[in-house]
């Protein structure tokens, strides 16, 4: 929600400085996200006159201009490429050292094609006050040379942007924001009575509402004989300041009412509407060319406004092109209605339309302001466009529901810990539009029609506390007896913490992604079941609970790549959902590596760059399992993985055939294509819930490390085995010979080719033998070696390579 300071002061009589108002807005729950002060940003830019503009000696499209900057000094030489640069032109000048916001550069003295340039003549786009970049700005001939441009152009009206929570629909208009500030002692609220505009004739257009649940109320008025042209300068500046494009007076009035009073309206060109209007559900096969230039396919779930020819408007979301108002409009129908919030939200998400009207209607508008909003809009139309108004046509209810809450004043202390005097409670609630009656400990509080979010006692406490001051809430620690146990993390919480630390220590950056993903992505990763669909998704592309963390991480990696950061390693630890039962929800640790983001380091390097591969993903997964306390000696790594992984470049980590702990490998190209991501991409995912808990020990102390005083011995073995034999089987066989003496078995060579029979391969291992009690003799070492050969032969069918 954006507004200017002067706009706010139309509704709030205040002398408070902007920084004080911004601080108070945040304190009362209307968080200020940004304040844009163009006067401050454009302070260095001045008004200047071009004295002469000569052809550049070395460029056809450049001119060498001598510019009078108004400082009393000699003219300044500026090289300019604008087609409208000419002698006598008054424009905006920036001197060296000035920051140009539209180009994100700081200007310096430069030489352009051999000619020195000591400044710049600016376009409106370079000052970020419009998108016009076809030429430098042209100011009136009487503009004061040397004056500050921002001050002369009256740009000293800061634009404030606030972040609204979904329940504060009343503050989607400047009027509601001013009311809150007045209640917080920031000024006096201006709330003049809206006088009805007397109709001069009956409205010839009738309105029928077929389904009152979709449209509880509808008001309409015809104004004849209007002259629709550009809106007044004050209105155009106000709309431009908040990022809206002025179109014409009638359309600008509806946009102004939307932001000023949180009352979306719609105007129809009455001459383009055939017959009467009906509010109904769309019919199968109906379409609408909307004001955004797009054609939408409608269905019976969509509420529309139609005439005898068909659909004219998407109710509460966007009007149709066919009945839109332009400079030829002479008769206008002004519509002010109430719409079903849920239907508006569902229709907007389904059609992918995010309009200002939808933003307000799906949150709920003030039902009692439906008719007064129409009266105020009629008054503005007559002031700007003239015309004769008809009488109002009102269908349905034009008022809000009466809500009176029995409120014990002690609730404020009970829920917030603050002692607020009862007179102060009444003052706050009264300024917010509530009515409080009764002297006793339980009072009656009447809720105003515009506060559709207030339904109970806790809501009233919230209103009182946020205005009184959340900074006054005392810090009260929970009481805990002397014999109370200190908090202890669960095994899963410990694994989660250790997994994060392990991955961070490997140079991977933690990311937090949505728990919701698209239906197509969910199906790709084995999800997409009906029970995992979100009943009321916040966006059409966030419809399903995620069966994996990888969908979000891959999207995040691609987003980084699209912005020029292709070498990225990301991880996330969070919940995944295989079903809607508690036992179908798991804690997972997942990660992606892209480009040169290998375990050797990130990005390219002069000493050589290593592309991330599946062994990096494997090492990441094993690091997580080791940190989580998995029995590493019992892990089995099986080639292959889920269908979304490359079949020849992936693996599955398991303990036995039933307990699959995770996967790693390269994403399948088809899966990446379906996700709209570029490859190759290395990924892993470990399910922390499936890691077996370590056996409990009688003491928490770790056993002492046993260091041997004797020299270790290493022996190399090369075995010829079938091609299908896994290296891990050979390693486990060798380790099992003597677990006290053999402290390490590593694979250092795999060979297939000349000298090896077809269907066979050679795997070489290094076995480390660590004596504990004495130095081993050659005979003892050879005995261990013989056992290694025998055990590997027995378990794998391999033979010692000659």
Swiss-Prot record:
According to its UniProt record, where is this protein located?
Answer: Cytoplasm
Catalyzed reactions per annotation? tRNA(Phe) + L-phenylalanine + ATP = L-phenylalanyl-tRNA(Phe) + AMP + diphosphate + H(+)
Q: Which domain of life is it from?
A: Bacteria
A GO cellular component annotation in the UniProt record: phenylalanine-tRNA ligase complex
Residues covered by the B5 domain: 400-475
Q: Where is it mostly found?
A: cytoplasm
Q: What class of enzyme is it?
A: ligase
Q: Name one GO biological process term.
A: phenylalanyl-tRNA aminoacylation
Domain FDX-ACB positions: 708-801
Q: Keyword Magnesium: yes or no?
A: yes
Spell out the InterPro entries in the cross-references. aa-tRNA-synth_II/BPL/LPL, B3/B4_tRNA-bd, DNA-bd_dom_put_sf, Fdx_antiC-bd, Fdx_antiC-bd_sf, NA-bd_OB-fold, Phe-tRNA-ligase_IIc_bsu, Phe-tRNA-ligase_IIc_bsu_bact
**GO MF annotation terms:** ATP binding; magnesium ion binding; phenylalanine-tRNA ligase activity; tRNA binding
Tell me which cofactor or cofactors this protein depends on: Mg(2+)
Catalytic activity, EC: 6.1.1.20
Q: tRNA-binding domain: which residues?
A: 39-150
Cofactor note text: Binds 2 magnesium ions per tetramer.
Binding residues for Mg(2+)? 453, 459, 462-463
**What keywords does the record list, in alphabetical order?**
Aminoacyl-tRNA synthetase, ATP-binding, Cytoplasm, Ligase, Magnesium, Metal-binding, Nucleotide-binding, Protein biosynthesis, RNA-binding, tRNA-binding
Give the matching Pfam families.
Answer: B3_4 (PF03483), B5 (PF03484), FDX-ACB (PF03147), tRNA_bind (PF01588), tRNA_synthFbeta (PF17759)
Q: Which PANTHER family match?
A: PHENYLALANINE--TRNA LIGASE BETA SUBUNIT, PHENYLALANYL-TRNA SYNTHETASE BETA CHAIN AND LEUCINE-RICH REPEAT-CONTAINING PROTEIN 47
Q: How does it assemble?
A: Tetramer of two alpha and two beta subunits.
| Stated family | Belongs to the phenylalanyl-tRNA synthetase beta subunit family. Type 1 subfamily.
This one is known as: Phenylalanine--tRNA ligase beta subunit
Q: What gene does this protein come from?
A: pheT
